[in-house]
Each structure stands twice: as C-alpha cells, then as structure tokens.
C-alpha cells in the first residue's frame, strides 16, 4: 500500500480526544501505480502524483476540520488490507478517486455501508467510473454519492458533505446532499439551436433490405453470442477471422502503394506529431490489408481486436488510419472487435447513405454540462463521402504512445445522434447532443468531440452497466428515422438522456 506522498500508509495510532471533532476521511486512489506502467487510460508514463497532491491540497485548504488518510489501491486485495486497518481506528467516510479505468476499489468500500464519495478523474478513470456508478444506481446503493467534473471545486464541495454525517446525519442524507449539490453546480441548458443539416435517408424497409446483403468481418475476437442475433434480426452476416489472415494480407501489401497513401495522409493532415514516415507507411500497409480482406470476402465492414492484436504481437501496425480511410469512403472500420458497435455503424451508415459512425469511450463532465466522445479513430467527413471534410491531425495511439492514430477536429454547432444496437435484446440505446467543440486534453484518446446532451444529463449516468462503455455517434438529427427503424424491427428504443 502506497500513500499519496509515496510513503506507506500511516499505521493506526492511538485515538486522541481532540480528534473526535475532526472528520476522518479515508481517500483511496484506484490506480495501477503512481507513475503509470502500462498502456491504459490516461496513458503510459502518466504521473499521478501531482494530481493527487492538487486534490489533497485543495481539500485541506477548504476543509481544515478534516483529517485526511490518503492511500493508493490497485484492486480488491489491496483495498481489503486498508479497510482492515480502518477497523482499528474507524473513519467517518471514504473518498474513492477512480484514476485508472477498471481497478475495482470502490466495490469493497461501498459494501461497508459507510458514506462514500466516488469521483472520476476525467479522461483517466472514466470507463470504470461510468460502469460502476451505473451499477450503484441500478441497485439503489444508499451510501454512495458521485462526482464527475473537471472542476476541482465541485469535488471539494462534495467532500464538505461528509460534515453532515459527523453531525448525526445518515449515509442516505450524505448521498442526497451530494446529488443536490451536483445538480445545482451543473449549468443549465445552453442554446440548442443547431446548424441546418439535411440528411439523405433510406426508408427503414430499404435500409433493412440492404443490410441483409451486408457482411462484417470480425478479426481476432468479438462476442460469439451476439453473431446469431445480428444475423436473425438484421440479416447482417458476421464472419470471424483469425489475426493470421490479416497479418498475411499486411505482409503482402504493396509497399509502393502504401508509401503513396502515407504521403497523401502527410499532405492532408493539419499536423503530425511523434509519428515517423515509416510508422505511417506501416499504417498504410494495414489499410491495404483491411481493403484486401473486405474484397476477398465481399464484405462492407471490418472490426479488429486492435489492442489485443497489437499488444500481443499478433499484428504489427495499428488499424486506426485504415479505419479512418474506410469510414471516409462509406465503408466501416470498427474498433476493438466490438461487434455491437460495428453493427450500429453498418445500420446507420446504410440508412444515412454513407455518414460515418464514430465509436467512442465517452466521458461526462457536469461542470460544462457535456458528454465528451473520445477515441483514437474518427472520420473527417462527418456528412458522408461527398460531404465537407474537417481538419485532422496524425498522432500516436494515446494509451501506449505508439503507432499512428487520428485526431479529427469535428465541426461545431450540429445535432448529433448517439446509439448502440442490441440485436440480442431487440433494443436501441439512444441520446442526442449538440456538437459544441473539441477537447485537446492530452490524457486519453486523441479525438474528443464535446457535446451538450439533449435532455437530462443526470439520466446519462444510468445505462453504462447494461450497455458497456462504447457509443456510436453520427452527425444529424436521426431521432425520427431511428424510432422508425425500431418500429420496423419491432424493437424498443431506450432514451438514455
């Protein structure tokens, strides 16, 4: 167990009478290591120590009557040891800061029943934070409040709610106070007027007819349980392929053609940073390999287990630039062999006659009333192959700072529609947001489209446990056609905002 200052957590000490007036707050940072030692959000090599110091200094300054007991934990076992120490000298409550995505620290803390404040370090712990928070909300866990804000003051103000417990309030009183505070500190809706954007749509019937002729390649993984439901309900054929077939196509790619494609990317990009010409040529060869597999199998889309393939040495270039090119041309390049998201892309790209879907790992920032859609693959032709292009940059893949990936600087002022299709449940998850800008925060994925959600941002915290982290975003007001598609299929639409 490592304390926030890099020292071991302080041993339990004798309780002093003057301590009884102070709020004893255990702070647990859920993370792999003080300096990140592996590829994950936010990125390899990230130094959490200055962030931790900033959090603790802000709390100490604003809450002089608090005794802070900081520690780091990478999972349930480490957490259990810390909680065991706390039994000897009980604390009044817990602050759990999710610094990396999936470290399961908050769960054993919540089980204690003590007042617990759960906080996201945005663009770092957001995946786990959203999924775990949704689990707490679904189970109506009575002792866990949460904060998801880029504004440190919002965290500090929520921490002050622990004083309620010290004065005799219950854990439920504490949670209600944090929820009230979060709503009060979230800005009201802005101007939701959007720029005109006429979408050329197929009818639901014609869309479904075309989907029955479509094939999706799933390379190196995927969810076998969903494939049959995709075929039965949408008519899309999903063909599973091994990494070996993609790697062979990559090895056989025409080097001169790859060099020419890479030069084209260099000329088109607004900026290139930390990506060598050789790496870009490897990415172009991977694009040619993707195209070769699509042609070989007569497919219109491909989704690759890119992280497992690259980290495991099964593939030797990231597919991100190839997906960028495919999505720009009206075909489908889908991340992480996420079949659900790839099928969502196929369905709506077909219905909109070429508009690309943007798979993302979203982040919610209540300080700005925004949902930020983040990933390292994105199109720069949001209105379809014949539509306008937006600027893009070529950077490394964020988590490991290797390879080549895309930062697409997407247009502001447009209505967007975000979806996930669940054929196995006959459901469509749906929300909309107005595009209001792009975040250039260095942490986490390169493309970060900022949207102001239509509806209730509080409601947006609720569905991540059932649907996972990924969402697929399209430019355009697609509410009516999505509901019409659901009606044609006999499916239910779940509005998550």
PLM ranges: what are they?
Residues 100, 108-132, 140-151, 324-337:
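Short, acidic/small-residue loops that bind anionic groups at enzyme active sites
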Residues 257-346, 350:
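Long, internal scaffold/assembly segments composed of regular secondary structure
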Residues 91-100, 119-120, 299-305:
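Periplasmic-binding protein-like
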Residues 327-442:
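C-terminal catalytic subdomain
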Residues 1-14:
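N-terminal export signals
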